[in-house]
Regions:
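Selective transmembrane-helix segments that form parts of the transport pathway or gating/packing helices
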Residues: 22, 83, 109-138, 163
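Hydrophobic alpha-helical transmembrane segments of multi-pass membrane transport/permease proteins
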Residues: 22-48, 74-83, 189-192
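Terminal transmembrane helical anchor/hairpin motif
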Residues: 42-66, 175, 182-255, 630, ...
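Long, hydrophobic alpha-helical segments
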Residues: 69-93, 128
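Hydrophobic alpha-helical transmembrane segments of polytopic membrane proteins
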Residues: 152-178, 241-243
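Extracellular ligand-binding/catalytic regions of CAZymes and related secreted enzymes
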Residues: 256-284, 290-309, 315, 441-457, ...
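Juxtamembrane extramembrane loops of integral membrane proteins
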Residues: 282-424, 428-447, 455, 461-507, ...
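Acidic, S/T/G-rich, low-cysteine, solvent-exposed domains in lumenal/extracellular/periplasmic regions
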Residues: 477-723
């Protein structure tokens, strides 16, 4: 008899014993009932939400089955309960009864015994998989264009986890004659493997070893439809390791082996497994396959194209100030968790390295503001913080030492990353003061693109009463332009920003790509006007923002563009807001400019709040421009108020006898024309407050603000689509359901009653047949 036949014979025998065991059927029935109940509860919520909302642009395959809130995640979270009960008697039962000695006396090797019993265990694991597979099949029937590939990967991850648990349980079953002890021992080993990943996280080498050894989170990527080579290798190594342990244990029972030799053998197997795991988990060795239809877990095509142009080694250095309020996120113990931020980039570019530099220095917004540290020196604060975090004080560079490397006082000594190429090009990648905090793909790719190309420079004109970016006043523009810790700020989206005073000596150089002229209060000097006209003549792009009361100053220049500001400001009737607040919407024509105007504004019914706004009209078309209205008012309830000038407090009404008329008014235009080899682009807004510091931070009920969207899409169009980075993905095709709320009862009957009842009847039938024979 060949080895394979012996193994299969042992597997069939043990599998039959399992199926004749009431414990196995109890496990199968409890598992099926709880699993189907979880699935139907999730599906009920999804179906109800779908019926109420009318559908959303989301992957229903993913919502139902993938991710941390999907159905398969709940199965993975609970499967550890069942496997120890399944494997506890595979060897311990025979050891306790003495029947194992018959196997020892037969011409069967220990390896054949172990493999046979292991195949029986994972064979029963296949039976456990039937319920999740049935749920996936049902999902494919009710979700048209079901995304099968990632769901199959998630099912594979679940089965690999079952296989690993079975190998561990089989080993524990070989160590004792008591089945309960074997089950408890298996749970203890699983607990250790879950906990070990948090040990030694402050030490680089130990962190890599313990993180790899940890089984916690090993299926997370697969549950998202991603196959990682290190995860597959992990399961193969763990299964092989514990099967080897079990084989050696049975072999040592058959013949006398000294305890020293046993210890050396176990240690050798363990070290070999750790070595394999360590080297196969190095960034250059890891291969990743994203099986989702939209490649949701991978870099977008735009990011991949940008990264492909980045040649040579690249270093991202994290500068962590112990005395900064954000330091706890980036201490050594958090290194592994923070790797996920740049992991897609490191996998795509193996010579991209992430380093950490730890230091301590005074941070204006740091722990020094705590009353506990009043009057203390930075050294005293360092000593206290290192004591709190249980860190070595010598890990942190002193203020003098860090300033020899880099002076971060302009960054307020807060946490910051610097990306640097081999030839010395560098750029900042910051954290932000919002819910997500860490940079997204858009900000990281923008930083990379700034190093491989010349970023567009946005120059804000000042000196004639214009809004300024260097000031943080209510009417100024620092928030969206140079605010370092604002995600949407131009400097964090790939632009360079500067201010120029063209009326008093500054020039508009050829390096400037976009000029912003925001509400002049006094006319430009002759020199300034000549410069602006020369910039306009050579095809420079402009963003012009006007405001009420500035017609006399700005209309002369706007007339050269074929645009005119109406004499009086707009009013909008509202029960909630003052009449001077105009809530403009994107026009249908604006969709020709950018995808944001086309998709986001109508999809979310975004409104641009424009307090104190004037209507714009095309005065003539003698300059070769194509005029595209991008913002407009409602057709009703909006008019040009000609009688009153103070619209903030006084109630106003549309007076037809005064020439006031309710109709749609244009509040922003986009102008474009072809000049030689380039297209000139200009945006003109009838309000300058709409992108001011105050307006961007105000929150009003009753509408969804699109002011930041206006900024992003305007500069996207003005920069020719170069920045901000487009990280859109293909639309989901599995976003429809073919069942409704009325079908929930049928679904529950099938999954909660019919499937568990069928399994129960089969189990009872086998038990009855077995007992009768």
């Amino acid at each position: 008899m060949t080895d394979l036949k012996i193994i299969m014979r042992i597997a069939r025998t043990d599998l039959a014993i399992l199926f004749y065991s009431p414990i196995a059927w109890f496990i199968l029935n409890v598992f099926s009932f709880l699993t189907t109940a979880s699935f139907t509860s999730l599906m009920e919520n999804i179906v109800t939400d779908y019926d109420l909302s009318g559908g959303k642009e989301v992957s229903l395959s993913g919502i139902c089955f993938l991710g941390s809130y999907g159905f398969l995640s709940s199965v993975v979270s609970n499967i550890y309960i069942y496997i120890p009960l399944l494997t506890m008697g595979l060897i311990s039962r025979e050891t306790a009864s003495g029947s194992i000695k018959l196997a020892y006396s037969s011409p069967v090797t220990s390896g054949q015994i172990v493999l046979g019993k292991y195949l029986a265990a994972i064979g029963f694991g296949c039976c456990l998989m039937l319920v999740p597979i049935a749920s996936a099949i049902y999902g494919s029937l009710v979700i048209p264009s079901f995304d099968w590939a990632p769901v199959l990967v998630a099912l594979l991850g679940l089965y690999l986890l079952i296989c690993a648990y079975c190998a561990i349980g089989l080993f524990m079953s070989s160590l004792t004659t008591y089945q309960v002890v074997a089950a408890v021992g298996t749970l203890i080993i699983l607990a250790i493997l879950n906990f070990v990943g948090s040990i030694g996280q402050e030490y680089d080498f130990i962190r890599e070893l313990t993180y790899w050894l940890s089984i916690n989170g090993r299926t997370i990527d697969m549950l998202n439809g991603v196959i990682r080579s290190e995860d597959v290798i992990y399961f193969v190594v763990v299964v092989t390791l514990f099967l080897t342990f079990t084989t050696f244990k049975l072999a040592s029972d058959r013949r006398t082996i000294s305890r020293f030799r046993q210890a050396i053998s176990y240690l050798g197997f363990f070290v070999a497994a750790m070595a394999i795991g360590y080297f196969t988990s190095r960034p250059g060795m890891i291969k990743v396959w994203d099986t989702t239809r939209t490649k949701l877990n991978s870099l977008t095509e735009n990011s991949q194209h940008v990264l492909a142009k980045l040649t040579g080694p690249v270093t991202i250095t994290n500068y962590v100030n112990l005395l900064d309020n954000k330091s706890y996120r980036y201490l050594p113990i958090m290194k592994k968790a923070n790797e996920t931020i740049f992991e897609p980039y490191c996998l795509a570019k193996p010579d991209l390295q992430v380093k950490y530099v730890y230091y301590y220095d005074f941070a204006p917004n740091g722990v020094a503001n705590n009353p506990k540290f009043q009057g203390k020196t930075v050294d005293e604060m360092r000593d206290y913080m290192t004591m709190i975090y249980n860190l070595n004080p010598h890990l942190f560079k002193s203020p003098a030492e860090i300033r020899q490397i880099i002076d971060l006082r302009e960054e307020q000594n807060t946490f910051v990353r610097i990306m640097e190429t081999q030839d010395g090009k560098r750029t900042f990648i910051r954290d932000f003061e919002d819910m997500d905090a860490t940079p997204s793909e858009a900000e990281i790719t923008a930083a990379i693109k700034k190093m491989i190309s010349t970023p567009p420079t946005v120059a804000f004109i000042k000196g004639d009463g214009e809004r300024e970016v260097s000031k943080s006043g209510d009417r100024d523009y620092s928030n969206f332009s140079i605010e370092k810790y604002s995600r949407a700020a131009l400097i964090n989206q790939g632009f360079d920003v500067c201010e120029i005073d063209i009326s008093h000596g500054d020039t508009i150089s050829s390096l400037i790509n976009i000029v912003v002229l925001a509400e002049m209060r006094t006319p430009l000097t002759e020199k300034g006007e000549n410069q602006l006209e020369a910039y306009l003549a050579r095809g420079g792009n402009l963003f012009i923002l006007t405001d009420t009361g500035r017609q006399e100053v700005m209309n002369p220049f706007l007339s050269k563009l074929g645009i005119k500001m109406e004499e009086y400001q707009l009013a909008q009737s509202s029960a909630d807001f003052s009449p001077n607040l105009i809530l403009a919407k994107a026009t249908r024509e604006s969709g020709k400019l950018t995808f944001g105007f086309k998709d986001d504004f109508p999809k979310y019914d975004l409104r641009v709040s424009m307090p104190g706004c004037v209507a714009l009209t095309c005065s003539n078309n003698d300059y070769g421009f194509q005029y595209t209205p991008i913002l407009e008012t409602n057709a009703k309830g909006v008019w040009i108020e000609k009688e009153q000038t103070d619209l903030q407090e006084s109630p106003v009404e549309c007076n037809a006898s005064a020439g006031e008329k309710e109709q749609t008014y244009i509040t922003a235009y986009a102008l474009s024309r072809q000049l030689k080899d380039k297209e000139q682009r200009i945006i003109i807004s009838g309000d300058a407050d709409c992108i001011s510091n105050t307006e961007l931070t105000l929150s009003r009920e009753g509408y969804r603000s699109g002011n930041f969207n206006l900024i992003i899409e305007s500069f996207r169009w003005l920069s020719g689509g170069e920045f901000p980075i487009d990280i859109r993905r293909p639309h989901c095709t599995d976003n429809k359901l073919s069942i409704g709320v009325k079908d929930i009862g049928t679904m529950k009957t099938i999954f909660i009653i019919i499937i568990p009842a069928t399994l129960l009847l089969i189990g009872v039938g086998i038990w009855f047949f077995r007992r009768r024979n």
